[in-house]
Amino acid sequence: MFMLPILAGNVFQQLYSAVDTIIVGRTLGSDALASVGSIGSLQFLVFGFCSGLAGGVTVVTSQFIGAGKTENARRSTAVIYMIWAVVSLLCTVVGIVCLPGLLHILNMPENLFQRAYAYQLVCFIGLGGQLLYNVESSLLRAIGNSKVPLIFLIISSVLNIILDFVFILVFHMDVVGAAAATILAQSLSGVGCLIYSFRKYPQLRVRKEDFKISFAFLADHLRVGLPLSIQDSITGVGMMVFQSALNGMGADAIAAYTACSKLETFVEMPMYSIAVAMVTFTAQNFGAKQYQRIRKGMKVSLLSCLFFSVVVGGLIIVFCKPLVSIFVGSGAAEVIRLSRIYNSIEASCLWCAALLFTYRGAVQGTGNTKIPMMGGFLELLMRVFAALCLSRIWGFPGLAMAYPLAWIFAALLNMWYYRKLDKNDFQCTRTSLI
């Protein structure tokens, strides 16, 4: 039941992202769609680093809450706010300064450069607001409340859709309007969660003295958070190599990937939501030393993810053309052809993603983030291999194998470590904070 609001929230979050894509693709054309899609890996790299760090340290907060240590939970929350402020500022400044060079690294086609630059510039400017929602929703989930983030996200989703139409169709702001709509909607959602959490939960109601923390306390949080941040950054680097190879294949290939990635994200949402729930569920029960509950939760989560991946993967393969046509229209024949190739490969391997998400979530919940980080390295290697080697041999189909290969190898590592933990009654790892 804890997972259901998380799932609904992720669906709504991807819904307004998909609406952005549909409006851009249908009203501004395939070049505009390709411009937005061509920087997806850069957005993941930056946002993944920031949200991975913030999300990682909330694992510690969850363990404090599970252990009933309210004062430490408040101090942990203060650490999260400090990290959010510093990281948001640094990434915004560095991102804006380095943006032209980053787009050149991505092998950005000349006809897409200006739109891609304008879109990403707005995203960098509003990065702090975007991250605020992720931080607050993670804190609320850490305390066991996954419904309130959903409520604010629904409001944000509706607002985002309205602003999309206003900024793009009324004010003719082009792709900048799509970026501004998303930034504004997510920022308001984050502020709403912040106000609610401060008023409702004493464990999250930080005081001035809570910010007076020792270096050791901060270091213990970073020990958990940094590997997750590095893991997402490594994944982002692999995606940038993938994106660079993709951008060299032209606007049709970029548009096909952009449309397919939106579908893929929707399909992965239930599995990802279960994984997010497993992190909190495992962390709280790990803090309370309820290891048998972790095992039961893992079994239910894994079976649910595998069943979903097989059923929905088959549906994606069968209904690929009408689904992709939602984003680009039925007249984009080459985009649809490439989308069929991509979806056939990805959808048939979704069960690998199910294994990865579930096992990785459980491992992260125990406070061990080094294994998921090592899995991130494996994902990087596989994406680079597909981008630099397989794409040269088989073209677009070879490039499409990047994600399945990444899922398989990272899943094997996390599976091995979880079974090691299970065999030793979860005594292989215990954070020094609990």
Where on the chain are the PLM-derived regions?
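Short runs within selected transmembrane alpha-helices of multi-pass transporters and secretion channels
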Residues: A54, V122-R141, P149-S157, A178-C193, ...
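Transmembrane alpha-helix boundary and packing residues in multipass membrane permease domains
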Residues: I6, N10, I22, V59, ...
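Transmembrane helical elements of multi-pass membrane transporters/channels
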Residues: M1-D20, V122, Y133, S156, ...
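Hydrophobic transmembrane alpha-helices of multi-pass small-molecule transporters
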Residues: L45, N160-F165, G190-L194, F266-M269, ...
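N-terminal transmembrane alpha-helices
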Residues: F2-L28, S41-G56, V60, A85-T92, ...
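Short alpha-helical transmembrane segments in multi-pass integral membrane proteins
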Residues: M1-M3, T61-G128, V170-L226, T282-C349, ...
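Small-residue-rich hydrophobic transmembrane alpha-helices
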Residues: L33-V93, Q130-P149, A256-C320, A353-G375
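Helix-terminus/linker motif at the lipid-water interface of multi-pass membrane proteins
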Residues: L15-A34, L103-E110, V166-V175, S233-K262, ...
